[in-house]
C-alpha cells in the first residue's frame, strides 16, 4: 500500500488510492491517467454529463447504464471504465472530479513530479509554457506538470501555486496594492 499523501484524503482519496494501487499492479498507471484525463475533459465540455454525474435524482442503475454508454463511445475501457462503474454503483460518482485530482497527485508523487496550478489572463503559447516549466523545475528539482487556467480578471501576469507556495504577479494584484497604498497616503 502506498504511503498516504496528505493532499489525498477523504472518500475521494480512498477511491483514488485504490485505483492507483490497482493501476500500479497492472502496470497501467499512464493508461488509467490518460483515460481519466479524457473523462475529465468530457466533464468540462458537457453539462449533461456533469448533471448525470452529480445529480442524486438518477438511480445507481441509470447512472451505471448511461455511464457505460458514454465510456464505450469515448473509447474508455479496462481498469478505468470498471472503476468509474464501481463509483456509479456505490453512489460516489459525484466525487469523480476530486478522485481524478487525487489520482493525479498520487501519480505525480510516484513519478517524482510536482504539479503547478497556473492562472493566466490569456492562453500561453508553447514557448512560454516550456520556459515556465523550466523555471519551476530549476526551483524544485522536479519535473513539472502545469494545470493552466485562463482567468481574464487577473488582467495580465500570472499566478503560480506550487505545493504550499504561491507567487502572484498578476496586474490585478499590483493595481490593488497601488490602490491600497494611495488610500493610506491620502
From Swiss-Prot:
<keyword id="KW-0375">Hydrogen ion transport</keyword>
<keyword id="KW-0997">Cell inner membrane</keyword>
<comment type="subunit">
    <text>F-type ATPases have 2 components, F(1) - the catalytic core - and F(0) - the membrane proton channel. F(1) has five subunits: alpha(3), beta(3), gamma(1), delta(1), epsilon(1). F(0) has three main subunits: a(1), b(2) and c(10-14). The alpha and beta chains form an alternating ring which encloses part of the gamma chain. F(1) is attached to F(0) by a central stalk formed by the gamma and epsilon chains, while a peripheral stalk is formed by the delta and b chains.</text>
</comment>
<dbReference type="GO" id="GO:0046933">
    <property type="term" value="F:proton-transporting ATP synthase activity, rotational mechanism"/>
</dbReference>
<dbReference type="GO" id="GO:0005886">
    <property type="term" value="C:plasma membrane"/>
</dbReference>
<keyword id="KW-0406">Ion transport</keyword>
<dbReference type="InterPro" id="IPR020781">
    <property type="entry name" value="ATPase_OSCP/d_CS"/>
</dbReference>
<keyword id="KW-1003">Cell membrane</keyword>
<protein>
    <recommendedName>
        <fullName>ATP synthase subunit delta</fullName>
    </recommendedName>
</protein>
<keyword id="KW-0066">ATP synthesis</keyword>
<dbReference type="InterPro" id="IPR000711">
    <property type="entry name" value="ATPase_OSCP/dsu"/>
</dbReference>
<dbReference type="GO" id="GO:0045259">
    <property type="term" value="C:proton-transporting ATP synthase complex"/>
</dbReference>
<keyword id="KW-0139">CF(1)</keyword>
<comment type="similarity">
    <text>Belongs to the ATPase delta chain family.</text>
</comment>
<keyword id="KW-0813">Transport</keyword>
<keyword id="KW-0472">Membrane</keyword>
<dbReference type="Pfam" id="PF00213">
    <property type="entry name" value="OSCP"/>
</dbReference>
<dbReference type="InterPro" id="IPR026015">
    <property type="entry name" value="ATP_synth_OSCP/delta_N_sf"/>
</dbReference>
<comment type="function">
    <text>This protein is part of the stalk that links CF(0) to CF(1). It either transmits conformational changes from CF(0) to CF(1) or is implicated in proton conduction.</text>
</comment>
<comment type="function">
    <text>F(1)F(0) ATP synthase produces ATP from ADP in the presence of a proton or sodium gradient. F-type ATPases consist of two structural domains, F(1) containing the extramembraneous catalytic core and F(0) containing the membrane proton channel, linked together by a central stalk and a peripheral stalk. During catalysis, ATP synthesis in the catalytic domain of F(1) is coupled via a rotary mechanism of the central stalk subunits to proton translocation.</text>
</comment>
